[in-house]
Every structure is written in C-alpha cells, then in structure tokens.
Amino acid sequence: MTTFETDAEPASIRVDREPEPVFSGPELPTPGPMAFFVVLVAVVVGLAGAFGFQSLAPDTPFVILGGTLLSAAALGIVGLYRYQWFLLIVLAVRPSLDDLIADEFGTFQPSAILGILAILVTALHLVGRRASGLWKRPTPLGFAFMGFFVLFIPSFITSVDRGISQGAMFGLASVVLLYLAIEQHLLDDTRFLYKILIASGLGMIVPIVTGFVQFFFTGTLDPGGSGLVRIDGSFAHPNTFATYLSFAVLLVISLIPTLELKHKLVAIAASGVGAFLLVSTFARGAWGSFLLGTLLLAARINKMLVFAIIGGAGLIGVGVPGVRSRIVNLTSSTGPGGAPKTDDSIGWRFGYWERIWPLSSRNPVSGVGIDATKTLTPEAKDPHNSFLQAYLEGGILGAIGFFTLLAVATYAAWKVWQRARRGEFDHRTKFISVGAIAALLSVAAQLVTENVLLNTVVWWYLNIGFAHLAVITWGHRSRFAPDHTRLALPAASPVQHVPPAANTNRR
C-alpha cells in the first residue's frame, strides 16, 4: 500500500503570515559615507557662490549671501536623501521669504533660490523614483498639470521678452514638479497629508506675526490710493497675502471638528487671527471669495452656520469703517482728494481689459509671452484676470492647458463632494476633503479679478488640495488612513484553512 502525500497542510494547522502594512511607503537609500563629502562640497560651493554674488552685488551683506546659500546647500542635501523632510521644510519656510527682496538683498532673492532648489531636488527625486521602480502612474490631474506646463513652452519661445518669461517658466516648473511629488507621496501613503498640513500650518506663523506688527506698529498707506493702511505680512503684496490667508484659514477651519480639544483651541485661535488679518489686508476680492468658501464649508458642517456667517459678514461690512469705505470705493473712479485711481476698482479693470485685448491678435497661437503683458502697456501691470492672462500670454495653446487643468480639477472636486454627501468617507476625511474643495473654490473665484495664474507661492499650497482630491478620486490603490495610526489588516485573512478534499490519502 502506497501513500501519496500532498503538499497541503492539515486543516488544523493555522498559517500565520506577517500582515502587510497597508499604508507603508517606500524607503529610499540612507546616506552613506559619501554624504560627508557631498556636504563638504556643498559648503565650498555655497561660499564660492556667496563670493560671486558679493562681487556682482557689493551692496548685499556677505553674511546674508553666505548664510542663504549655505542654508540652500544644506537643504539640498536633505532633499537628496530624505525628500519628504525637504518638502515639509520648504512648505514651512516659503511664506516667510516672499518679501525678502529690495533693501536687504538687492536683486538677490531667497525665494527665487528656494524655487530653483525645489526644481532641481524634486526633478532628481522623481527621476530617482522612476529608476528605482517606485514611480506610480500620475492621476488625470497630474497629467493635466504636465500638459499645462508643456503648452506654455511655445509662449516662452516666442515671447516678446524672454527675460521676463524665463522667471515665470521657472515658477511654473516648480509648481508642476511639486504637485507631482506631493501626489506621488500621497499615493504611497495618504497619511503623509497630515504632515503636509502641519508643516503648512507652521508656515503661517511668520506671516501672521509680521502682519500683527504691521497692523499695530509699522503699517504704511496703500500706494494704490485707497487711503487705507493695508498689511501684507511677509508677502510682496496685500492681495497675495489675502489669497494665501483665504486658502489657509479655510483649511484650518475644516480641521477643527476632527481635532482633540487642545489642538482644536489652537486651530480656532489660528483661524480667528488669520481671518482678522484677512480683513486688514483690505483685499475685496479675497473677502468675497473667502465668504463664498466659508458658506460652502458651513453648508456641509451645519446649515445653520450659513445664516450666522452671512449675518456676521453684514455686520462687519456696515460696522467697520475701513471695510465699509473699501466696499463703497469698489466702483469709484477717483481716489482720496479726487485723484484718479490706478488699479483699485472694477471700473479700472474693465477699462484695462479692453485696452489689452488687442494684444491677442499679435500671436493667437502662443500669445505674447508668459508674464509679458506688463512689458507692453504704459501701466506696466498684469492683466488682473487669470483667464484673460492665460489667453493673451499663452495664446490658444496656453488657454487650452489652463482650462483643461481647471476642468479636470473641477471634475475631481465634484466627485469627492458627491462621495462626501453619500457618507463614503470617515469623519476626518470628510472634513478635510470638503475644506480642500472650499479653499480651492475660494481661490478660483479670485481668478476673475486677481493675478493668480503666475502667483507661485499660492500655487505651491493649492497643490496640497489638488493632490488630495486627485488621490481620493483616482488613486484606487491608495486608501485614506484611519483616524488612528495603527496599521490595518489586509483585506484577505492571514488565516487559511486547507479544504478537506486536499488532505486525503490516495491508495
């Protein structure tokens, strides 16, 4: 009698397997001995660059040049070995650098250096991911971002002023590369979003503190002729500061219902202070778009809040003198003392749009050149309308890229909104998603009257909301992490039983 053994294990034996971490992300190689040599080279290059800049711009203090370039070199080393750390540091410090120009730095701008560093490090990181097999197929929104950049390249090539357009293309490249990097890491592990939000929250500290100092001590009259003291925080213009605040404050508000008590109090304080400074920028477009975003957010949290927000906005508009005069001044054609207004009213914008529209006939296909409108008008100003700017400066190609990006983002936002309404998300995911939609809508509303298209610092933070919505919509292999941090079990049970038929002896 011959017994044939099968490979199957008896039914009584449990096969325990190590659970695969659902949310773990890939690890890149750790620094080796070569890192010390690379750091030494970075220090030498930083000092050499500082001496070079010193010879070109002798009025710039050497300590600022050397310190900035050394910091950039060190940050670059961090990015080559730990890109997530690099990304978080960049998001935390970028708002502090926007206005570091002119007196202290001359033509030397730390924000520009950080942008170039972000391009180089992020490009190397993405290439490294692809070479290592870690690259994930971008979402449709990722492809839309790439198309947005590619379709503006002809605009740069045929630009009437390539010097101006060159800087704008660098800014656009940094936006697209950072978006792709954020999307890739969220596809790896959606919990990374929490770290991004924390880093971005830390980035609000310097602009808020600077804004308060300006409001109480060092504020200056608005050069646009409004007669008001407008604050710009650490940004180059009050409108940019207001756009940044409208997006950031809405995201913070959306997080409040998901936090523990002590963190909730911090978020409430931060959103209150941010809203106060937003009012103090006297940027009317940002006021209206922020109100729109808060109404949308309130409609998903508690519909009774809608009436409270409308009533509060009305009281501020009527009761605060500066706000009331700013709203009344919206359609005025003259400034204080009867002086003609420059760029401070809807009427001026309509007139300016009419004057610059003939520029579209110069090169209908690729436009006059990205960021080149201001070089062709006596006012030397941007179009103050991002839709018009995309067509005038990018031509038909640029407009296709920009409108396609907006269409794909709108589709993603609509899909996420519908899923949130159906209750398909956990508590935290729901509020973050709705907050991202409200914040993005708030900025999108400013595209009609503000220069948002090439506002690099704003786009860097819009990328967070865009990438979150894209991963939720199309990242089928990536699930949003639960509120706790423990790893979830795989969908398939690790306990397997052998079917009875597989454990029989054959004679």
Language-model-derived ranges and their functions:
Residues 79-90, 133-146, 193-199, 266, ...:
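Membrane-interfacial loop-to-transmembrane alpha-helix junctions, especially the N-terminal start
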Residues 263, 396-442:
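Hydrophobic transmembrane alpha-helices and their immediate junctions
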